[in-house]
Every structure is written in C-alpha cells, then in structure tokens.
Amino acid sequence: MKNKAFGQIMDDAENPGFFKILRSADLSSEIMRGIPLNFIKSISEEELSAKMLLKVSWGSSWPIKICRNPSFYFMEKKGWDQFLSDNGLGNDEFLTFTHQGNMCFTVDIYQIDGKELLTPRRSATIASSSGRNKREQRNNIYKDVKEEEDIESWSESSYPGHKTAESTGRRQRLSLSNKKAKETEKSKKKKMKVESISYDSQDDSLSLVPEFTLTIKKSYLIFLGIPKMFEELHMPTEATMFKIHDPEGKRSWDVMYKFSNNQTRFCAGWIRLAKELGLEIGDVCTFTLIKPTEMLVRVSK
C-alpha cells in the first residue's frame, strides 16, 4: 500500500505542486525523495533535464539534481540531505512544493504544531535582549557555538582516554625528536593509533570501543557538535543518517550527521531526540559507536 504522506500532488492549474510529510524513519529514502508521477507529466523533458531549485520563504535556496530509476523520478540524495540539514528538518514537518516554472519550487514549511516556518529555525534560539538585528545575533551565536565546540572537542571531558593518550603521544614525540624528517608521518600514525584507545581502570584492560562524552550546553539542545578527534577517527566523510539508541534498547532516533571541513554535527532529528530524552543544560552524555552508523547514548543528570 502506498504511503499517502509521501509526495502527493497538489492540483493547481497555474502552479502545480506536491507535498511531503517528513517521517524521520524515511528521511533519505528514494520514496521520500520521490516526485509524483502525475506532477512529472506536467513538466517538459527539457525542464526535467535541469536541476530543481528549492526556495524557502526567507530567500535561501538549494539546487538539487533530478535522478530517475525504472519506476519514478526522485531528488538526488546529497542535495536533499543538505536541504534537510541546513533547515534542521526531520520532525514530522509538512512541506509543500509549488512549481513556479523552470523547475524552481517555492517550499513552505509547517511545523508539527501546524505553525508555518517563516524564518530560519535556529534563529529562534538567539537571545533578543540587545538591540542588534536578527542577522547580527545569528552570526554571533554561531561564532560562539563554534568556539565552544572547538575548545570542548580537545578537552579531556570530550573524549574518554584522551589524557592518557595525550601523555603517551608526548612521550612518543620526545623519543622521536632526534629522528629524520621522513619518519614524521609514521610517528603521527602511531600517535593516532594510541589516541584511539581508551583505558578502563575498573577492569585494568584496554577498551577498543569508540566513545566520547559531552556536557550539554544551550546550543547542544539544537544540534550536537562532534569532537574533532572522534570525528577524524570514526565518523563518515559525507552526510549520513545515524540511528541512536537509548541504553535500555526500547527507543531509537534517526538523526542526520552533517559533515563539513569546518564543523561536523548531528542536526535534523536531534531536537526531537533531545526533547524525548529530556536533555537539560548540564547533563552529561556519553555516545558509544556500536556500528558504523549506530550509537548508544547514556545520560547522567
């Protein structure tokens, strides 16, 4: 049976379109990215050969390549995931796509409470106590968040075993200081290998299970920055959907992992996880990588 939440057509003679409901379990599937056949029939072959442009009410836009399988047309995964990630989507939002011509679509976003999203979602978290305009506030908060994450990603609390690995790496650097320059790369690889191992003092053994620990701050209730060291050692180098489980195995959440040169983070779907776990500022969260794209989260209040 066809899921009626995905890609249904909106009948308008002048501006045809379609809608989608963003179910977290299917955010990146071909079905979710699909374009209704009845809508495709109203588009010329020439238009279909071009990229489609998704434009939201505050002016931002995303070009997305159109792909095809034997059954239907759909949006390319990379561009679609970028659109979801940049707008923090993935919590049962209702989206309408209205065709304005030349494969340019106006996208209207309605939150789960029915309210239309008219400004970037993350701007709602910016403090309004000063007289600065919204753009200045948004730029400043992201600058502060990035600085906090850069500091925390290298702190001992951000990565179990980091203190031990750091001291071991320091001894290695001292012992290699008199060696030739051609051995530098080899020593870096050895240091990286040592730092990827965390020490478990309780059973006096080495644990190879990758994990990191973060203390929840205000920004982490919106999206979660991944510590730089952990990201370099264990995380994928492209946007990927992760499944995060609670310790009891009764609940799990699909969360979008966004990769870039400047910052890597969990975004679309993270707000829902934070709400349902009841995360608060000051909580300590430990994330254990149990599969390449699955994690276990433990929360200490």
Swiss-Prot record:
It comes from the Eukaryota. InterPro entries: B3_DNA-bd, DNA-bd_pseudobarrel_sf, REM_fam. The keyword Transmembrane helix does not apply. Its main location: nucleus. It is found in: Nucleus. PROSITE patterns: B3 (PS50863). Residues 123-142, 153-194 are annotated as: Disordered. Keywords: DNA-binding, Nucleus, Repeat, Transcription, Transcription regulation. Residues 18-113, 209-301 bind DNA. SUPFAM superfamilies: DNA-binding pseudobarrel domain. Residues 133-142 have a biased composition (Basic and acidic residues). One of its GO terms (cellular component) is nucleus. CDD domains: B3_DNA. One of its GO terms (molecular function) is DNA binding. PANTHER family: B3 DOMAIN-CONTAINING PROTEIN REM-LIKE 3-RELATED (PTHR31674), B3 DOMAIN-CONTAINING PROTEIN REM14-RELATED (PTHR31674:SF62). This is B3 domain-containing protein At5g18090. It comes from Arabidopsis thaliana (Mouse-ear cress).
